[in-house]
């Protein structure tokens, strides 16, 4: 069964409600809000990246390499779900401009291990800083109303990930000693 077939089969709509159990356009509103939230969440770092001639793909690579030093090319491809050709283009930019360095694996010399340089770590920190401010503001706004915004947001975002992928995401996050709690 394909992912689409499984997803369709799992959705049991209640008469008068959509697949999210909402009335009318409420689920459309939620989906639309996710689009707008994503637009603004990535828009802040996009402006910084443009100053370097970089784009979102560069940001994604920096984000994971700075958090998981020694990440292999294969691991990064698995995380980002992009083609090797796309990754090579982005890595070439980041390596040539001194933001990432690659080293040969000690156990397997065919492996290329990725590390951020100080400049790469600084750029990644700048990008994270603007995104953290946006998330912190949103959580603070919600916490005033609910008191549990961070936990709710964490659980919601984890639930948005495909069920068969959640454990892999939690394992990856555990490498930073954060985990999925």
Regions inferred by a protein language model and the residue ranges of each:
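Flexible interhelical turns and helix-capping residues at alpha-helix boundaries
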Residues: 38, 69, 80, 84, ...
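Exposed, interaction-prone assembly regions rather than primary DNA-binding/catalytic cores
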Residues: 148-181
